[in-house]
C-alpha cells in the first residue's frame, strides 16, 4: 500500500510539470502579455519604444523557455504573479475564493448522499413497484433539467415568493449556500441514485443474498452489512469525481447566485481576459483531478480487500 502510494506520488511529478508548462504556454498563445493587457485596461497609449522597454524590464523579451523557468521558480515559492485587472497577487485572490468553494462542495455532497443513497436503495428493494417508478421518474426529470433552470426555479419560489433564503449570496454562510447547494444536489442525486439502484440490484441477484435469506438472516442485516459494503466502491467513485467537479467550481450556478467561489472567479477572469487568474484556475483544475483520482485508487484497497492496487483483482 505504502509503496504503491509513493510510486503514484512520484508519477505525479512529471504530470504536474506538464500542467505548468501547458498552462504557461496557453498564456503565450493568447497573444497578449502583461504590458499590453494593462495598457488596454487603463486606456493608456504607449509608444512602441516604451512598450519594448516595459517588456524588457519584465523579462518578456527573453526566449520562451527562459521565461517559463523563471516563472516556474517563482511559482514554487508561491508567487503566481499579479492579476491584470486588480493588480493583486493571484495566489491571494485564489485563496480568498476557496472557503466559498469548499463550503459549497461539502454542503452539496452531503445533500447528495442524503438524497441519492436512501432513494437508490429503496428503488432497488421496491423494484417494479409504484415506489420504484416514481423514484425513477423523479430521477429522469432531475437529469433532464439544466442547472440554470433549477437555479431560477429555486430563486423564484424559495427566495422571491417564500423568502426563505436570500436572492443573492451576500456572505459565506449556510443560509446563503443553501440554494446553490440544493441546485447541485438535485442534479447529482438524480444521476447517482440510478447508479446506486443498479449496484444494489446487482448485489441482490447474487447467491449470498439468497443464502442469507435461507439461513433466516434479516434482510436489513444483509442489506447494511453485505450489500452496502459491496456497493461502496461504486458509490465512493461517483462521490470522489463529484468532489473534483465541485472543487473546480460550478461556474453557471455560482454566477446565477453570485456565489463568490472559484467558478465565478474563472468566469469573471475569462470575460476580462485576466490571463494569470485563468492560468491559476487551469492548474487548479488539473491538480484537483490528479489528486482526486489518486485518492480514489487508494480508497479501493480499504473498501474491497480483493482489489490489489496494481490493478489485479484476487
For each of these PLM feature ranges, what is it?
Residues 21, 25, 29, 122, ...:
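Hydrophobic membrane-targeting alpha-helices
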Residues 60-117:
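An internal, D/E-rich "acidic patch" concept
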Residues 2-7, 11, 118-154:
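Cytoplasmic-entry segments and transmembrane alpha-helices of multi-pass inner-membrane transporters
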Residues 17-21, 106-110, 149-156, 283:
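Hydrophobic alpha-helical transmembrane segments of multi-pass integral membrane proteins
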Residues 16-66, 163-179:
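Hydrophobic alpha-helical transmembrane segments of membrane transport/permease proteins
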Residues 30, 142-145, 247:
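Transmembrane helix irregularities
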Residues 136-198:
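Membrane-water interface segments at transmembrane-helix boundaries in multipass membrane proteins
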Residues 2, 94, 98-131, 171-314:
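Alpha-helical transmembrane segments of integral membrane proteins
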Amino acid at each position: 500500500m505504502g509503496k504503491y502510494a509513493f510510486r503514484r506520488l512520484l508519477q505525479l511529478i512529471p504530470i504536474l510539470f506538464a500542467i505548468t508548462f501547458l498552462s504557461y504556454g496557453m498564456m503565450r498563445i493568447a497573444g497578449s502579455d502583461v504590458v499590453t493587457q494593462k495598457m488596454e485596461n487603463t486606456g493608456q497609449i504607449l509608444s512602441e519604444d516604451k512598450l519594448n522597454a516595459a517588456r524588457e524590464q519584465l523579462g518578456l523579451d527573453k526566449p520562451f523557455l527562459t521565461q517559463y523557468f523563471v516563472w516556474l521558480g517563482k511559482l514554487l515559492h508561491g508567487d503566481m504573479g499579479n492579476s491584470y485587472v486588480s493588480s493583486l497577487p493571484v495566489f491571494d485572490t485564489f485563496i480568498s475564493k476557496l472557503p466559498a468553494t469548499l463550503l459549497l462542495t461539502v454542503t452539496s455532497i452531503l445533500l447528495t448522499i442524503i438524497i441519492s443513497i436512501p432513494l437508490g436503495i429503496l428503488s432497488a428493494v421496491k423494484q417494479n413497484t409504484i415506489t420504484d417508478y416514481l423514484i425513477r421518474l423523479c430521477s429522469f426529470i432531475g437529469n433532464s433539467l439544466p442547472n440554470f433552470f433549477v437555479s431560477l426555479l429555486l430563486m423564484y419560489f424559495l427566495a422571491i415568493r417564500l423568502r426563505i433564503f436570500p436572492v443573492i449570496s451576500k456572505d459565506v454562510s449556510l443560509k446563503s449556500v443553501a440554494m446553490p447547494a440544493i441546485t447541485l444536489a438535485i442534479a447529482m442525486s438524480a444521476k447517482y441514485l440510478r447508479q446506486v439502484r443498479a449496484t444494489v440490484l446487482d448485489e441482490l441477484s447474487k447467491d449470498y443474498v439468497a443464502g442469507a435469506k435461507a439461513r433466516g438472516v434479516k434482510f436489513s442485516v444483509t442489506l447494511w452489512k453485505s450489500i452496502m459494503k459491496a456497493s461502496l466502491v461504486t458509490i465512493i467513485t461517483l462521490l470522489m469525481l463529484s468532489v473534483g467537479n465541485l472543487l473546480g467550481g460550478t461556474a453557471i450556478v455560482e454566477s446565477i447566485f453570485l456565489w463568490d467561489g472559484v467558478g465565478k472567479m474563472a468566469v469573471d477572469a475569462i470575460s476580462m481576459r485576466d490571463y494569470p487568474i485563468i492560468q491559476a484556475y487551469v492548474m487548479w483544475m488539473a491538480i484537483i483531478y490528479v489528486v482526486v483520482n489518486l485518492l480514489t485508487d487508494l480508497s479501493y484497497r480499504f473498501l474491497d480487500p480483493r482489489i490489489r492496487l496494481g490493478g489485479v483483482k484476487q
